[in-house]
Amino acid sequence: MIWTRAEGCRVWDENGREYLDLSAGFGVAALGHRNPRVMEAIASAPVAHALGDLADAHVTQELRRRLPWPAKLGVTGEDAVEIALRTALLAKGKPGIVAFDGAYHGTGLLALAATGFEHFRAPFTAWLPGPVHRRAYGEDPGPLPDDAGCVIAEPVQGRAGARVPPVGWLEQLRERCDETGALLIVDAIYAGLGRIGELWPGEDVADVICVGKALGGGLPLSAALFVRRELERAWHLGPEDVLTHTHVGNPLACAAALVVLDEVPKLLRRVRAAGARFAEEGWQGAGLLRARAGDAQAAERSGVIVIPAGLDGSLISATPALTISDEELDEALSRLRRTTDAWSRSS
């Protein structure tokens, strides 16, 4: 399918067919496609240059001021994870990573090593760094290995199918980290910025929170947020930044992010209410990060876009715009109900 137009929670293909989009581009379009405030912010951004890395634009500095903790910016979610993992090595001097089955942290080699999907890792095993100690998601990892500089976990797993850990699990990880001095990294790239009804999931326990996807309002932007503020100093290694990219802090993305930070807090109650509607229909997860058994292609034929998900690919995932209306949600769920009922009968 080729999208030729997108507005809010609806997209149109090259044949002019309209779809209800429950993917929001893997959660990126949290305020809806072509959100008017985001579009206006991009169009009117006081951009003196298009680069991000050479020097901060004023709008980039404003974003840094608006974030609740010191931040090292990236372009992709994977960048934020790489920053967080390298922070642990710099701060603790230990290369070991404790990660979890079903985790998805990115496909760069360091983030990939921590990712829990074997089919992503297998072609590149010879190059993957480590050691990585893999544990069962949602369970007590036990005493951490001596070489572990950090634990990295998602507050709700996205690609694995909206897996929600038991209440208190992140606090349990915090206790395990405190036993050895390891850092706790919360990868909230998918679940953060309102997706599960919280702005900064894990903020009470994390040393570093990774955010991305929704942050740039549709443009590429991510950040590793140093909740433990002194960790920022781990990167004071000399006159030149040793981990950067050409477009870090791109002013257009930063202008869009300022709108996201304005608007998402107003939507948290709405997210929880809409999430309850999904739960009534048998969708697991939290907020507007949801999954259930189903067929993404069948859903597409019914005019609804969802994402294949799950450890074995047998689930469909819904991550709609946080702005989805009751009418759009009812329409999408009605179509999906017929689709999943038919899929269940044929399975």
Located regions from the model:
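Conserved N-terminal phosphate-binding loop of PLP-dependent enzymes in the Aspartate aminotransferase
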Residues: M1-S347
